[in-house]
Structure formats: structure tokens, C-alpha cells
């Protein structure tokens, strides 16, 4: 068994700035026999088009394996796209102070300040101004923190602490033959 890289680019619609796409990348695990079958079909039919080589009919289990891998990859790519879209556009409603406190306790957020930087015209400490600065620093930190997490950890964090939820039902995708297998077919020709 070997893993083969697969990729997708999905058109999700049009926004005011043009087309919206989600890109995905994953792997599919195939046996040597399955790889040989794909290579032979490509060489016999002279095409890499899954429909034209009639893979779904002639080798339904192999097709089902590729179909599942492409479906799961496409679904994940679309899910992550909309999850980040919601975050970037402020769609999720959560208690800012509660999240900040959690991140101070559990995630390493720390706001260090000098009281002299937050004095009002009378020389008194301006707690409100310091609060704004802390909130701004937190959101910058949070953005960096989230973008540094794995997809699974982002999904978990946003779901548990930001009430983020995305519904991805019907995913459009195309089943293809992994590029490395296509290259093998060309090399052996």
C-alpha cells in the first residue's frame, strides 16, 4: 500500500470580488494491484478521464475508494473555507471577555502594559483605554494563534469557544486519478 497525493479546486460561487474557490489536498491509499489497474486502464484507453475509462462500472471498489477520498477532501476544503470566512468576517457570536480570559489561562495570551501609557489628561489611569488596547492586542494574538493551529484544532477551538458552526451538505467534486499514477502510466508507455 502506498499513499498518493490528491488535490482539488472547487468553485463555490461568485462574490463582489470575483470567483470564490476552495482548494483541498489529501492522500488516498492504494494497493500495488489498484495502481497497476489504473496504469493499465490509462494506457489501454489513452485517457486519464475516470468516466471515459469507465472505472465506476469496471472496477467499482476502486472507484468507490477514489470517490470517498475526493468527497472527503472536497468536503473538508469547503468546510474550512466557510469556517475561516465566518471568522474573518466576524459572523460568530461569542463573549469576547470570556474568550480572552480562557486564552490567558489556557493558551498563552498575555497583555503586558505600562500604566503610564494609559493616563488621562488628569494623570489618572484610564482603564477603558487600556481595555481597548488589550482587546486589540488580543484579537491580533488570536488571529496568529488560530492560523498556527492544525485544521482539526481550529475546528475544535472555534466550535468550543466561538460557537462556530458550518453546514456543508452537498459538495461538488470530481473523481480523478492521482497525478503520480498518471506519471507512472506515461513512463511505462
Question: Model features per residue range: what roles?
Answer:
Residues 1-31, 183-189:
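Short, extreme N-terminal segment that most often corresponds to the first beta-strand
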Amino acid at each position: 500500500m502506498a499513499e498518493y497525493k490528491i488535490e482539488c479546486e472547487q468553485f463555490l460561487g461568485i462574490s463582489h470580488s470575483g470567483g470564490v474557490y476552495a482548494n483541498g489536498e489529501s492522500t488516498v491509499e492504494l494497493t500495488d494491484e489498484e495502481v497497476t489497474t489504473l496504469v493499465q486502464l490509462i494506457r489501454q484507453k489513452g485517457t486519464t478521464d475516470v468516466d471515459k475509462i469507465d472505472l465506476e462500472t469496471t472496477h467499482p471498489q476502486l472507484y468507490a475508494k477514489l470517490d470517498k477520498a475526493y468527497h472527503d477532501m472536497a468536503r473538508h476544503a469547503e468546510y474550512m473555507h466557510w469556517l475561516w470566512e465566518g471568522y474573518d468576517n466576524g459572523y460568530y457570536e461569542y463573549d469576547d471577555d470570556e474568550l480572552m480570559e480562557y486564552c490567558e489561562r489556557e493558551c498563552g495570551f498575555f497583555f503586558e502594559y505600562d500604566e503610564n501609557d494609559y493616563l488621562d489628561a488628569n494623570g489618572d489611569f484610564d482603564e477603558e483605554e487600556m481595555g481597548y488596547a488589550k482587546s486589540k492586542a488580543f484579537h491580533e494574538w488570536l488571529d496568529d494563534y488560530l492560523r498556527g493551529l492544525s485544521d482539526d484544532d481550529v475546528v475544535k477551538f472555534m466550535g468550543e469557544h466561538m460557537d462556530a458552526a458550518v453546514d456543508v451538505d452537498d459538495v461538488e467534486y470530481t473523481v480523478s486519478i492521482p497525478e503520480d499514477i498518471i506519471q507512472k502510466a506515461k513512463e511505462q508507455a
